[in-house]
Design a protein with these regions (language model features):
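Active-site loop-to-helix "anion-binding N-cap" substructures in soluble metabolic enzymes
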Residues: 1-250, 257, 261-272, 276-338
Length: 338
């Protein structure tokens, strides 16, 4: 097995105790200028990181920004597969992530060797993979999709084309229901969306009878069947900010609520609960590994740095580029407008 490499030389720098009087925001701005760097952040990052970023968006938004940037360095505040996407699209640019351990349960659920064995059972199927997977799995794929564009891209494939979809089983089931396509599904799930609890959600609906429910399609069907709106994080954000309602229950990682509060401060936003009735399950532990301190160190020292073997990168580029070519214009949040 050839692994995607994260250059870990000097990664002990992540454990350095910084001067408590250091103005990290100012220092990051200096590095942004001196290194011609762009900071990309996912909606699931902490509010502090979102507010520092040049662009905030979902996976599709940020993939497009990574493909378009003229920066020499991309500091990707998300999880590892997102940094890999940036490197696949920009092999000559330096791509750093704040924490090398910021993985993804969906990526972990789909080891490249096991996926290769699985897809070998379906040689006549077009392999469609959700972007939440490793570069090695992307390299085995025919096309990449995100939750923003999965249904529209699959609808563009010939009706008689057989499809294998991985790694998110819940997203695959939702797309199957929405498009009517009979797909072979890999059994992966997201640890955040998997934990939302129907019983506790119904209690919340009873408590807030006028609330609208917005859910990410990575949620189980037991949650989705209660939703007034199902979509990607950006789609959920647009729904909350534009729909004429005052109260919303949000079934996705709760840091998206930061953007909702900025864009619609007059609305009441309630995170969907887990089995214990609290909203603690709505925090991604992998996204939470990143911090402003780690971002500063990553930009200053250019580690952890994403490096991908060229044969894997070139094979992964083809399905990723195909996705971008088939996707409408995305609209990530510009730092100056957020």
């Amino acid at each position: 097995m050839i692994n995607t490499v994260i250059d870990s030389e000097h990664t002990e720098l992540q454990d350095v105790c910084l001067d408590p009087f250091l103005d990290l925001e100012n220092e990051i701005d200096k590095l942004r200028c001196s290194k011609n760097a762009v900071i990309l952040a996912h909606y699931y990052q902490s509010p502090e990181i979102q507010d520092l970023a040049d662009f905030v968006g979902d996976s599709l938004d940020l993939s497009k920004k990574a493909a378009e940037t003229n920066a020499d360095m991309i500091a990707f505040c998300g999880v590892r597969f997102m940094g890999e996407c940036a490197k696949i699209l920009n092999p000559r640019k330096t791509v750093v992530i704040p924490d090398k351990e910021a993985g993804c349960s969906l990526e972990d659920s789909c080891p490249p060797e096991e996926f290769a064995a699985f897809r070998s059972k379906y040689p006549e199927h077009t392999v469609v993979t959700y972007i939440n997977c490793s570069a090695e799995v992307k390299a085995q794929s025919d096309i990449i999709v995100t939750s923003s564009n999965a249904a529209s891209i699959i609808n563009r494939l010939p009706k008689d084309e057989k499809i294998l979809f991985a790694p998110d089983h819940h997203l695959g089931a939702y797309i199957t229901k929405k498009t009517g396509r009979d797909m072979v599904l890999w059994p992966g799930t997201c640890i955040v969306h998997e934990q939302f609890n129907e019983r506790e959600l119904v209690k919340l609906i009873v408590r807030y009878p006028g609330a609208k429910i917005a859910a990410h399609p990575e949620c189980p069907e037991a949650i989705l069947k209660h939703a007034d709106h199902i979509g990607s994080t950006r789609s959920i954000l647009e729904y909350v900010t534009s729909y004429d309602a005052h109260t919303f229950i949000i079934a996705t990682e709760q840091h998206i609520i930061h953007q909702m509060n900025k864009l619609a401060p007059h609305k009441t936003i309630i995170p969907a609960p887990g089995a214990d009735g609290t909203c603690d399950c709505a925090n991604c532990p992998y996204m939470a590994k990143n911090s402003i301190e780690k971002l500063y160190l990553a930009m200053a020292n250019e580690v952890p740095r994403i490096e991908i073997p060229e044969d894997i990168r070139t094979r992964a580029l083809k399905p990723l580029q195909r996705m971008l070519d088939l996707s409408p214009n995305a609209a990530s949040q510009n730092r100056n407008a957020a």
